[in-house]
Amino acid sequence: LPALLPHGTRVFLPALPADPPDAISQALGLLRREGRGLVPVPHVAATRVASLDALERRLDAWQGAWGGALREVLVVRGDAVGHSTSGEAATGAARGAFGCSLDLLQTNALQRGGFERVWMCGHPEGVAGVSAADARSALREKLSWADAEGVAAGVATQFCFDPGTTLGWVDALRDEGSDCDVSLGVAGPASSELLRRMADRCEVAPPPSPAANAPPATTDADAWPWPYTRELARWQAARGAERGVQAFHLYPFGGLRPSLRWLRAASRDGATAGLGLDRLEWPEQAEGVL
């Protein structure tokens, strides 16, 4: 499947508690062999890093797996109870050298390891019992660190089902003066049951219930995420590229292939014009497969 991804796609590689230590290195090797023109973004779970030395050895291993050309990374807090992209403001004691992702960032180990862009987590609805305001305060501290260090920063947000909440969160970020890239979390096509299950697991508000007389398509993967992305397209057109978002952070809960089929259809859909999906460069292998 990596060979079917559009050229230039960022592929975020989560750091999950149950994964073996070399899981991300193996994933990087796979992407290097089978993907073309992809941009890997491995996750560092700060509170699960045993020491600064362990962090530096891990970064070196990742660089080795990608031929020394790895330039982007996403830093999360990494609580065992959190979702793979949750956690900067999540509760729970540190199990390693760092109490939060800012502690790790301030070592400057990422810059020494060759990384030029650091992605951070955005939580429009808050996370793990922490309010959206407190989560934003934690994000603001990390963005201030990036500004002071001259590090390019990006924010990848948790998925939400209420466009008003998500887009209002981005508006507030821009009103604070931040011009960092925002990759907006979007749950890929999946059944209503699965979307609700993932919402519960990731502690976000569930998708709205379909009307009792709704046709079947509104309760399965054929419906979502069209309503959300079309609302996003209208919002983006009103804001412009600089105050809007720069990318989707697609969560393929229903499977990568269905998500790619949806993305390909969305790139040809006039209602999503302005999101830049029409500029995606699909590999020849995608023809007739997606």
Specify the residue positions occupied by each region the protein language model found:
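Conserved, mostly hydrophobic/aromatic
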Residues: 42, 142, 151, 184, ...
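Active-site beta->alpha loop and helix N-cap motifs at the rims of alpha/beta catalytic domains
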Residues: 1-136
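Short catalytic-loop micro-motif centered on adjacent basic/acidic residues
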Residues: 12-13, 42-44, 154-159, 247-250
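A structural motif corresponding to the C-terminal end of an alpha-helix
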Residues: 34-37, 107-116, 145-153, 231-247
